Amino acid sequence: MPLSLLLACLFTTVTLQSPVVLDPCSAYISLNEPWRNTDHQFDESQSQPLCDNHMDGEWYRFTGMAGDAMPTFCIPENHCGTHAPVWLNGSHPLEGDGIVQRQACASFKGNCCLWNTTVEVKACPGGYYVYRLAKPSVCFHIYCGHFYDICDEDCHGSCLDTTECACSPGTSLGPDGQTCFDENECEHNNGGCSEICVNLKNSHRCACGVGRVLRSDGKTCEDIEGCHSNNGGCSHSCLGSEKGYQCECPRGLVLSEDNHTCQVPVLCKSSAIEVSVPRELVGGLELFLTNTSCRGVSNGTHVNIIFSLKTCGTVVDVVNDKIVASNLVTGLPKQTPGSSGDIIIRTSKLLIPVTCEFPRLYTISEGYVPNLRNAPLEIRSRNHGIFPFTLEIFKDHEFEEPYRETLPTLKLRDSLYFGIEPLVHVSGLESLVESCFATPTAKVDEILKYYLIRDGCVSDDSVKQYSSRDHLAKHFQVPVFKFVGKDHKEVFLHCRVLVCGVLDERSRCAQGCHRRVRREAGEDEDSAGLQSQTLTGGPISIDWEE
């Protein structure tokens, strides 16, 4: 064969193939873990923080119980199954925009964007979004998913006569024509902020750089003048530093969350509230609560007062998303010198309002300024705690005797009696069981779930609810069941509880059954953003073999 013909054959048979570029709208990895959702609050006592260190620039889509899309507003730390949740700092694109770049921020230690990276986003024809997510440089960071409000067939949104959905202020209609996505006000004129704009759910806020604070208009910033101006706003000591200044407290007091006010230490527990007042602050005063029979006891360094939510004149109220217990510690001069040698006083009266906050869904002290006149010295003591419930399995329909040592082995035709019981019985409060579901394992985020109660509604017609004398207790009966499969011989129950005020006719508890779409558990405006706690009971062994 001639050389020219051989070369011609070689050139006609060797072809170069162009690499196939796949559309990320059809080539993506699904993220469907329930703990990714913004409703999932991380509890370090129950699990370890998670991290997305396995990601390496692939395309992802949020599906299932993880949510519909990434949140475009700041997510508080300790959500989405980790310490530092990652959110999208920018609006989602339109379908015609193609692939766009957005900043993703991790929230931690009060900073909505302590860490950031760049991700790519694309709006797909099916009304959903895909994301090209980078591997976080440090742990513990997780990319969050979120369920956005939708206009459903029952018109829980604002539906127009044209069957189109009108979204609430701060949101806009997504490409699917029914989902209301959060608007990022910071993308328009920086939200009106002179320096830093932080996008929040349905709103935004302005912030300032180091050494600067917001003016009263909430938009512009001014320099912090330091300790020489009004003591820097510190209730006690003000120390200058290169970055500005910092406040410090005398021994026995602690700095409050505002980083300016020194507080009396207070420990909030459902069983007792403990206030510890430094002896130097008390001097020759005698401390007592609203009920004057409840008095402080000195241990040499502190005067301690311990009381419960039901004693010593404690007042319990429901305020927004919290249960608030309050009392007042009053200090008056002793009639005679005490055994500790107090023979002088430096103030004529001491007032310490004590406040403990507990989350509704299953939470400290201001300055000591010497005052020698007759005006009372006031210190605020404030802290957070947990208002606990237990999920009990009972022996019969009287709901008086729960299984304690060992849980029962039941047959499929038996009745299962279970209930939510408060560890502390407080009048003026009531509860709503927002959801109860069963799993074959003790894991709350188990993929295989069977709902008995959902959105405050009974979702299984065989579930029967019993009345209870205590507004906080809830009792139920359901026929025994098991999960399909010979290996599934146990059943675990998990319930979420919300606490409200009995007299609040507009509360989520008063509304009762409230169906929502695409939610793991019913969430009304009244309970949005509340701290959640899931109660777990079991295992219940099933004797199913005939």
UniProtKB/Swiss-Prot annotation:
Q: What is this protein called?
A: Oncoprotein-induced transcript 3 protein
Gene3D superfamilies per record: Laminin, Zona pellucida, ZP-C domain, Zona pellucida, ZP-N domain
Cystine pairs = C186-C197, C193-C206, C208-C221
Q: Write the gene name.
A: Oit3
Glycosylated residues, per the record, are N89, N116, N299
Keyword rRNA-binding annotated: no
Concerning InterPro entries, the annotation shows: EGF-like_Ca-bd_dom, EGF-like_dom, ZP-C, ZP-C_dom, ZP-N, ZP_chr, ZP_dom
Which organism does this record belong to?
Rattus norvegicus
Q: Name one GO molecular function term.
A: calcium ion binding
Q: Which SUPFAM superfamilies match?
A: EGF/Laminin (SSF57196)
- List the PROSITE patterns hit by this protein, alphabetically: ZP_2
Location of the ZP domain: 261-516
User: Where does the record locate the signal sequence feature?
Assistant: 1-16
Q: Name one GO biological process term.
A: renal system process
Where in the cell is the protein located? Nucleus envelope
One GO cellular component from the entry?
A: extracellular space
Coiled-coil features, chain-numbered ranges: none
Organism placement in taxonomy: Eukaryota, Metazoa, Chordata, Craniata, Vertebrata
This molecule's function is given as: May be involved in hepatocellular function and development.
